[in-house]
Amino acid sequence: EDTRPRVVALLYLMLLIGMIGSALIFAALLKDFGYVRLIQVIQSAAVVTLLLNVVAMFKQEVRRPDLTAHALARPTFGSAWRDFITLPQARRLLWALGLGTMGFTMQDILLEPYGAQVLGLSVSGTTMLTAIFAGGMVLALLIIARSLAKGTDPILIASIGVLFGVAAFSLVCLSALVDSSSLFQLGVVLIGFGHGLFAVGMLTAAMMFGGKKMAGLTLGAWGAVQATASGIAVFSGGAIRDLVSSWGEVGLLGMAMRSPAAGYL
C-alpha cells in the first residue's frame, strides 16, 4: 500500500523515457526526410520493437501453482463483474476514466499534422512533439510521486490534470490565430502535463478501488475502458477533422472557417 504511488509513477516514468528516447532518435533519422528513408525507419522500428518486447516479456511473471491449481474454486466472470459494478462509485470511476481518456487522446493523431499543415513545422519538428509531450508528462510525474506519497486524493490530481488539459488545448487553438509555433509547443507541454496528472491519478485510484479482492478485476476494467476510449477517440478525432475540413473548403461554415486550421479547431 505504501509503495503503490511510487510503483505507478515508476511505471509511467519508464514508459516516458522510452517515448522521449524514440522520439529523439526518429527526429534525428528523419532530419533529411525522404520516402525511402521513412520506409527504412519504419521497417527498422518494427524489428527493434519485436526484439525489445521479447526481451521485456521474458520471465516477466513467475508461475504460481498455489494460485493457479485447477482444484481452486473460481467465481465466474459474470458474478465477479456484478460484484464489482455494484460497488459505490464504480460506474462513475469508469465513466470519468473513459471521457477523460477520450478528451486527451483525440489529439494523438492531430497534433503532428496540425503543426505541419497549419504552422509549417518540418517532419523532424513534428516528430519532436512526442518528446515535448512526454517531457510534460515527466514533469507531472515528479509532482505526482511526491503528492501521492503525502496522501493527496488521486481523483483530485486527475481533476487538476483535466483543467490543465483545457488550458493547454486553448493555447493550441490560439497558436494558429497568432501563427506561433512556440505557443503551440507550450500547449503540447501542458497537454502532456495534464495527461500525466490525469492518467496516473486515475490509475492510482483504480488500484486503490475495491480492495485486494477486486484488484485484478478493477485493473482489467481500467485497461479495457482506457483502450476502448482511446480507440474511439483516435477514430472520431480524425473523422471530425476530415468532416469539418471538407465543410470549410466548400464554404458551408463561412469564409472565416476556410482555412487549414478549421478541421483541427
PLM regions and their residue ranges:
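Intracellular juxtamembrane helix-capping segments at the cytosolic ends
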Residues: 1, 197-211
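Glycine-rich segments within core transmembrane alpha-helices of 12-TM secondary carriers
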Residues: 5-30, 223-237
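A membrane-interface helix-boundary motif in multi-pass transporters
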Residues: 28-47, 239-265
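Helix-to-loop junctions at the C-terminal end of transmembrane segments
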Residues: 30, 139-156
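C-terminal membrane-cytosol helix-exit motif in multi-pass small-molecule transporters
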Residues: 46-65
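Juxtamembrane intracellular "pre-TM" segments in multi-pass secondary transporters
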Residues: 63-94
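Short amphipathic helix-loop junctions that connect adjacent transmembrane helices
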Residues: 109-126
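C-terminal ends and interior cores of transmembrane alpha-helices
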Residues: 163-179
